[in-house]
Regions:
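Alpha-helical transmembrane segments and adjacent TM-loop junctions that form the membrane-embedded core
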Residues: 1-112
Length: 112
């Protein structure tokens, strides 16, 4: 009986330790694929490209994203931003920070 209890405790501790380590190292959350997030974002009308994407867990239930978004037309920025945030929320990403660029100001290779 004691070994069974010890095994249950070890299994619980391992799961908690793994999740805590992933959170503390800002790892990509389980179930989130960066390539799928990029495809979802680029499918929004008005988005020409997406780059410099970072996704991390804020907690065990909340995820965050930052990304650079290249727009076909800057005047549509607010509309595109609302659509992107709605799509990302559906994908389980609730805290979103986006930096918008025109295709003329695109920063490949120079983004920090």
């Amino acid at each position: 009986v004691g070994l069974v209890v010890a095994a249950v405790i070890v299994a619980s501790v391992w799961s908690l330790t793994r999740d805590s380590l992933r959170l503390s190292l800002d790892g990509v959350p389980v179930g989130i694929r960066i390539d799928e997030v990029e495809k979802t974002m680029e499918a929004v009308p008005g988005v020409k490209a997406v780059h410099h994407i970072h996704v991390w867990a804020i907690s065990t239930t909340e995820n965050a994203l930052t990304a650079h978004v290249v727009l076909a037309e800057l005047p549509r920025m607010e509309t595109v931003k609302r659509q992107l945030k709605a799509e990302l929320e559906t994908a389980g990403i609730h805290h979103v920070t986006l930096e918008f660029e025109s295709s003329a100001e695109h920063c490949p290779g120079t983004c920090d």
